[in-house]
Amino acid sequence: MTAATPAAPASPPARRVRWGLDDAAVGAVGAILLVLAADWALSHGYLTDPRLVEVLSYLVVWVPLLGSVLVACYLRGSRSLARDFGLRFHPLDLLWGLTIGLLTRVVASLFEIAGYGQMGTTGATLDAPAHDAWWIVLALLAPVLIAPLIEELFFRGLLLRAVAAATDARRPVALAVACAVSALVFALVHVVDAGSPTALWVVGAGTFVFGLAAASVTAVTGRLGGAMVAHVVFNGLVVVPALLR
């Protein structure tokens, strides 16, 4: 009589994903309100330190966006950014990203020429570089690397997928609606503190076109890799020339 083979341990049940439009709405509305609050504080003289202003200009957007992504993933989702929001990279994403980033930056530059009569008016304006840790973080890492990671996780990860899942339509239609909504919200967050009507439509049009292209490649591939590379290129083509100017 042979001993019975012990049964393999049962795999833990998959976590039930409960994130959706409410998580995305909290992040987007929170970012808009904090941007407006920071703009009000700056205009009323409560913020005077240039470095503090520059740091807050990033944090008021990043904190609510990244916070909503992390809450959705680790408290209400699968605890995997790859499964929940497509944070994956394939070598082909490099080609997607370079192409989209270059083309959308050209389109955004055409909007600048139409609105201002020249390129670069809406780009970065930087003082003489100090080449210290602050300069490296605020002038290079923040706009070129950190912003693409956080913003793509939210806009093309959480928001796009939440809208697609909530749209009562066939998948191609749901994805098209989700791409348009994510691009609109992306543009809105970038123009909520626009200083003039011209800046409003120039920046709004450029960011909407980029957002639509990034959302489309994400919808096609199911990954954020291409959108993140495109975002790095799109921002880098503004920041790097400003640094070399």
Model-assigned labels for residue ranges:
Residues 49-58, 126-128, 198-209:
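Non-cytosolic membrane-interface motifs at loop->transmembrane helix junctions
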Residues 101-121, 149-156:
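Transmembrane alpha-helix/helix-exit interface in multi-pass inner-membrane proteins
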Residues 93-101, 128-144:
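Alpha-helical membrane-spanning segments of integral membrane proteins, especially the hydrophobic core
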Residues 17, 86-90, 125-135, 170-172:
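Helix-boundary and loop/linker segments of multi-pass membrane transporters
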Residues 86-103, 176, 182:
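Interfacial segments of alpha-helical transmembrane regions
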Residues 109, 134-245:
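Transmembrane helix-loop-helix hairpins at the membrane interface
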Residues 1-92, 105, 109, 113, ...:
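N-terminal, membrane-interfacial amphipathic/helix-forming hydrophobic leader that caps
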Residues 116-133, 159, 165:
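Membrane-interface interhelical connector segments
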